[in-house]
């Protein structure tokens, strides 16, 4: 686990665009974000917006050309090189997709939420899974981070 997570000054804007009693607490979202951030990071700002299928599908279609809802979309903030700002970007997470995937993959819902937050944060930090080498590196780091939170390997069959 990120041993200095309490030292990171985190400004998390949690936006709930859907009513859902199964959503994790803001404290859980903050813990998962802090765990995904590098130990060297002093401060970070990001938005996590929890949405329904319609909003997820619209954004996924507009920005990725895929006309279906998805679990998490990451929108990294890229400041001009001469400007240092702690803004990482935005994560858009579709609650119904996360819930359905957890059920289909036989995973505890909280574990899958944690995985989606970690996965999205790694994208904001520049990680990707476009080719096999990148995917292997990212999945290895995700597994390490999710397991440090007390959950099982998210890529292992349950």
UniProtKB/Swiss-Prot annotation:
What EC number(s) is this enzyme filed under?
3.1.-.-
Which superkingdom is the protein from? Bacteria
Q: Please give the PROSITE patterns that the UniProt record associates with this protein.
A: UPF0054
Subcellular localization(s) per the UniProt record? Cytoplasm
Per its UniProt entry, what is the enzyme's top EC class, as one word? hydrolase
One Gene Ontology biological process: rRNA processing
Query: Record-annotated residues binding Zn(2+)?
Result: 119, 123, 129
What cofactor is needed? Zn(2+)
Return the InterPro entries for the record: MetalPrtase_cat_dom_sf_prd, YbeY, YbeY_CS
What detail does the entry give on cofactor binding? Binds 1 zinc ion.
Keyword line: Cytoplasm, Endonuclease, Hydrolase, Metal-binding, Nuclease, Ribosome biogenesis, rRNA processing, Zinc
What does UniProt give as GO cellular component? cytoplasm
Family membership noted in the UniProt record: Belongs to the endoribonuclease YbeY family.
Give the function comment from the record: Single strand-specific metallo-endoribonuclease involved in late-stage 70S ribosome quality control and in maturation of the 3' terminus of the 16S rRNA.
Please state what the protein is called: Endoribonuclease YbeY
Q: Please report the organism this UniProt entry assigns to the protein.
A: Shewanella sediminis (strain HAW-EB3)
């Amino acid at each position: 686990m990120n041993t200095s997570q309490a030292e990171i000054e985190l400004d998390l804007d949690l936006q709930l665009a859907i009513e859902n009693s199964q959503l994790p607490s803001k404290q859980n979202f903050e813990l998962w974000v802090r765990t995904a951030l590098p130990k060297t990071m002093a401060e970070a700002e990001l938005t996590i917006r929890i949405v329904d299928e319609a909003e997820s599908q619209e954004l996924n279609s507009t920005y990725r050309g895929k006309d279906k809802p998805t679990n998490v979309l990451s929108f990294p903030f890229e400041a001009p090189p001469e400007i240092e700002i702690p803004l990482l970007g935005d994560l858009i997470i579709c609650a119904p997709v996360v819930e359905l995937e957890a059920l289909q993959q036989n995973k505890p819902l909280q574990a899958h939420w944690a995985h989606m937050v970690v996965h999205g944060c790694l994208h904001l930090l520049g990680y990707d899974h476009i080719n096999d080498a990148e995917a292997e590196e990212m999945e290895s780091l995700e597994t390490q981070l999710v397991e440090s939170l007390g959950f099982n390997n998210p890529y292992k069959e349950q």
